[in-house]
Amino acid sequence: MNEQYSALRSNVSMLGKVLGETIKDALGEHILDRVETIRKLSKSSRAGNEANRQELLTTLQNLSNDELLPVARAFSQFLNLANTAEQYHSISPKGEAASNPEVIARTLRKLKNQPDLNDATIKKAVESLSLELVLTAHPTEITRRTLIHKMGEINNCLKQLDNTDIADYERHQVMRRLRQLIAQSWHTDEIRKQRPSPVDEAKWGFAVVENSLWQGVPNYLRELNEQLEENLGYKLPVDFVPVRFTSWMGGDRDGNPNVTADITRHVLLLSRWKATDLFLKDIHVLVSELSMVDATPELLALVGEEGASEPYRYLMKKLRARLMATQSWLEARLKGEKLPKPAGLLTQNEQLWEPLYACYQSLQACGMGIIANGELLDTLRRVKCFGVPLVRIDIRQESTRHTEALGEITRYLGIGDYESWSEADKQAFLIRELNSKRPLLPRNWEPSNDTREVLETCKVIAEAPKGSIAAYVISMAKTPSDVLAVHLLLKEAGIGFAMPVAPLFETLDDLNNADDVMTQLLNIDWYRGLIQGKQMVMIGYSDSAKDAGVMAASWAQYQAQDALIKTCEKAGIELTLFHGRGGSIGRGGAPAHAALLSQPPGSLKGGLRVTEQGEMIRFKYGLPEVTVSSLSLYTSAILEANLLPPPEPKDSWRHIMDELSVISCETYRGYVRENKDFVPYFRSATPEQELGKLPLGSRPAKRRPTGGVESLRAIPWIFAWTQNRLMLPAWLGAGTALQKVVEDGKQSELEAMCRDWPFFSTRLGMLEMVFSKADLWLADYYDQRLVAKTLWPLGKELRDLLEEDIKVVLAIANDSHLMADLPWIAESIQLRNVYTDPLNVLQAELLYRSRLTEEQGKSPDPRVEQALMVTIAGVAAGMRNTG
């Protein structure tokens, strides 16, 4: 174990040293000395030296306005470098073995050792594997794209330095490159000046595909194939690609007025353009490589006399010409030019697949399998995974927008006000219209801008090439009419196929009613006919946790999934559960393997569809090797969950969870909703108001411009509490509930649940992770520096609660310290704390100065404002997640 850490620590130390030299060259010895003094004080403070802790506070409080930014940047950049080293460590030969693709081999061996599983059953489970990762542009990716690129280059340098055979002169060159990259990062502004537009966000998503997934996916499939061949004697079929990617970037308009129908249309074109660009690079390589002459009669017939001398090249050149013509047409469309479609325009995956697969079959038949299974196989697999659209997009819109649009239509037609009708009347009207042959929308009618936007979006879906839009997600779905309304609006737009429409249940009440809503829908004959035996339902993690606290939300999510699985099974419907998880614990984030195995039995039968949000995309897919690792973990978890499902919880365990849920929800809401001091405390103890100044995502922080905590989106809500290290949304209520159940004499039952029920042990594990990142003295310091004395008792009460919660969780888990079973993560948090602590102290000081300036009616000092933004980015890097 220690060997693993020493490799990581020596890389972190080496990168820190280079950063120190860079700072000295840029700003002089005195700034580096100041940074080093603060670092040493922080280390000593962490080790428990109270005098040094006080000195740390005094030193940071006394920094001049000119010193603020360099000090903030030094610690922030160090944390980015530490994260880069850690990401490399997770895939390096000296790193944590669990992250390597070996995880698939371990799972296959485990499955083979089960007496009631045979190879045929395992093979069948592999063939039904389905993994869809939905990339979302949540404003949590705080790091600029230009810096992410440099971090990737630094990773490559670490890889080269890890090579034991590296010659001295090569090592010298790599170190020089490393110094250049760290200097470039230091001299780059880490805070972007403008908010990204939805198109910028989409381009960020395409960059992830190009820089990592494009190579990572074929590498993962090669790895999976090798492990299956070795363990089961089974080869993956060429056309079997169990993973695909969808994006919300450019499609998610929930609460984001910047995502319009025109934006979605533009992003769809841009996505196709990027696909042609990437496939052109692949075909260019194949034109060069496939110089072979031997071919099957079928291939020779396909190329004719003209291509007989180099049949493979001939086909590849023809495909290249089609790709180039398609790209030119898409470029013109993106510029707003209306051109007729050229002959041979590529719109369907089959058009790419057929010539490539013809070459593949011919090479195999002519004894050149080794060539067929090289670059050509990788390209074929990319066609299956990415294809002509590159990434499909989801459309997401809030349910009330559809209700308002239909209300406007019915009022204009003089048939009443749809918005005020009962649920039964709405359903009767919708089913009647869905069965009707005549259009509902009147001609020459001028709708309001909001309604026009909803209708235009439906038109974009109807016009988009088939397969480029994956699903229509309805956020804040509450009733069957919410789902039927979308189907009617799509029908009116002229959609010619059954678009998957997924209701998103995201508050406590909506999760509790989810099964009832879906049962009603499945009892409608028209609806059953439309969905053809398939239904997608999205489970919201972030908003339910914000509404009721993590304990109540996670139990409601579990029960909703459990009920939906059973209802759909009974009705003969294939259910796909779509998990809207965030990166942070308060938004449903958890280590993938543990999270998947803790779900109700049968929840992954229809495959896994899950959001990958903001900064988690970079941590899990930022490099091809990390992509292989992440996809391997998902694959092994899905196989294990489907073949060795977790046990059904005992009735007594369910009763305890009901109890925990009620107590934790009451506690959570008692503070967040009912305590009159809570909102003023939240606003002053965290940088919530200042977060709005950060140009993070294209989406506003609030659903409505006014209003309290309830109108805040889940992300800024979590982000703010992560910054001041109280981490409140991720634990409030949970420990109080556990303590009450322990006091009722049920500790042994809780211990059994922790031992034998993955759902419960994962909940406790997530709490331990949060507790490891929370910090009582820092949260206290924010109070001392920023909060009115009248609110101090509330802060103390919350910190005391946190302390009690830690004790009760350790008692149930039978551990003496946090994260005892995940020492690697505990070590990683400790490593970063030394650098995050000064940023937290500095942030509290900067918030104090910034607010004082505002109170005095003076204009803000740009040095203070800029340094504040840097500390926010730095703490986010230290915590490894933002919201």
Swiss-Prot record:
Pfam family, one: PEPcase
Alphabetically ordered keywords of this record: Allosteric enzyme, Carbon dioxide fixation, Lyase, Magnesium
Enzyme class, first EC level, given as a word: lyase
Membrane spanning residue stretches: none
GO cellular component, as recorded: cytosol
InterPro entries: PEP_COase (IPR021135), PEP_COase_bac/pln-type (IPR022805), PEP_COase_Lys_AS (IPR018129), PEPCASE_His_AS (IPR033129), Pyrv/PenolPyrv_kinase-like_dom (IPR015813)
Enzyme Commission code(s) on record: 4.1.1.31
Catalytic function, reaction form: oxaloacetate + phosphate = phosphoenolpyruvate + hydrogencarbonate
Molecular function, one GO term: magnesium ion binding
Listed cofactors: Mg(2+)
PROSITE patterns per the UniProt record, alphabetical: PEPCASE_1 (PS00781), PEPCASE_2 (PS00393)
Activity modulation: The enzyme has distinct binding sites for each of the allosteric effectors such as acetyl-CoA, fructose 1,6-bisphosphate, guanosine 3'-diphosphate 5'-diphosphate, long chain fatty acids, and L-aspartate.
BP term (GO), one: tricarboxylic acid cycle
Active site residues of this protein: H138, K546
Function statement: Forms oxaloacetate, a four-carbon dicarboxylic acid source for the tricarboxylic acid cycle.
Family listed: Belongs to the PEPCase type 1 family.
Subunit note: Homotetramer.
Protein name, entry field: Phosphoenolpyruvate carboxylase
Biological source species: Salmonella typhimurium (strain LT2 / SGSC1412 / ATCC 700720)
